[in-house]
């Protein structure tokens, strides 16, 4: 039974999902926006959020930050994918937001990959943004100046999210090893040098870093004391597999 313990901590969810931060204090990275006294942090803490676009590479926390904003401001949160949604879905969501507004509740509509919407789809948000029915938060890996139409862009603040630094990724990996939502209930032996190796490989992407650690731990060697040891050899094998599958990884966190 001890050998199965690694699978008992709700591993129906990936490690990155289990460790998704719920507060600004848990959030790692983007200190240029979220450090004490920084503009975006002040807007969140004072509940003065308006429509905005998060522009940044994959795995830097765009979706997570939108959820934290919704939790902090006590707004209804509607997660909306530009890949699977059209005008019909937009109208349905806007109707729900109007209902919330009548009851005095704010609605944050988070649109992942907003650059995938065409002009007509983006225009469908305009009247609701203008009259304050919704707070629109869009996420994109593409330059919004070219991918978001000017009318909508002019009504949104653009915040640039940066790749996580190697030290920030190492911090995240160490948390995964100690947090009960991660591997905190297990005894995992992995050298700091290997954690840094994962962080460098992840190239600023938190999801890739956590997924790599998860694969390495689940493929580690169990010793007589029920500890899992992650060796350099095991990690290198995992890195080679992840490298092969890298183009298909999700593009946001």
Model segments located where?
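Pre-Walker A (pre-P-loop) alpha-helix and adjacent loop at the N terminus of AAA/AAA+ ATPase modules
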Residues: 10-52
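Conserved C-terminal helix/linker of AAA+ ATPases
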Residues: 220-241
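Single conserved hydrophobic/aromatic residue that forms the stacking wall/gate
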Residues: 242-253
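Conserved AAA+ ATPase "SRH/arginine-finger" region at the nucleotide-binding site
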Residues: 157-170
């Amino acid at each position: 039974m001890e050998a199965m313990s690694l699978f008992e901590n709700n591993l129906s969810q990936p490690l990155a999902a289990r460790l998704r931060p719920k507060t600004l204090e848990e959030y790692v990275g983007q200190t240029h926006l979220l450090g004490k006294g920084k503009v975006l942090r002040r807007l969140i803490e004072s509940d003065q959020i308006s429509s905005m676009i998060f522009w940044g590479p994959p795995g830097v926390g765009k979706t997570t930050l939108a959820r934290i904003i919704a939790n902090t401001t006590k707004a209804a949160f509607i997660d909306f994918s530009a890949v699977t949604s059209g005008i019909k879905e937009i109208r349905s969501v806007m109707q729900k937001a109007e209902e919330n507004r009548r009851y005095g509740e704010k609605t944050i509509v988070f649109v992942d990959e907003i650059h995938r919407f065409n002009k007509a789809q983006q225009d469908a948000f305009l009247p609701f943004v203008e009259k304050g029915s919704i707070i629109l938060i869009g996420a994109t890996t593409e330059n919004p100046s070219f991918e978001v139409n000017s009318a909508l862009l002019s009504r949104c603040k653009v915040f640039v999210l940066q790749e996580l630094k190697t030290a920030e990724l190492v911090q995240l990996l160490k948390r995964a090893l100690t947090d009960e939502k991660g591997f905190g209930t297990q005894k995992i032996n992995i050298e700091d040098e290997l954690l840094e190796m994962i962080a460098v490989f992840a190239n600023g992407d938190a999801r890739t870093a956590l997924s790599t650690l998860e694969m390495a731990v689940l493929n580690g060697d169990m010793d007589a004391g029920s500890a899992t040891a992650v060796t350099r050899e095991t990690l290198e094998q995992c890195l080679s597999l992840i490298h092969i599958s890298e183009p298909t990884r999700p593009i946001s966190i």
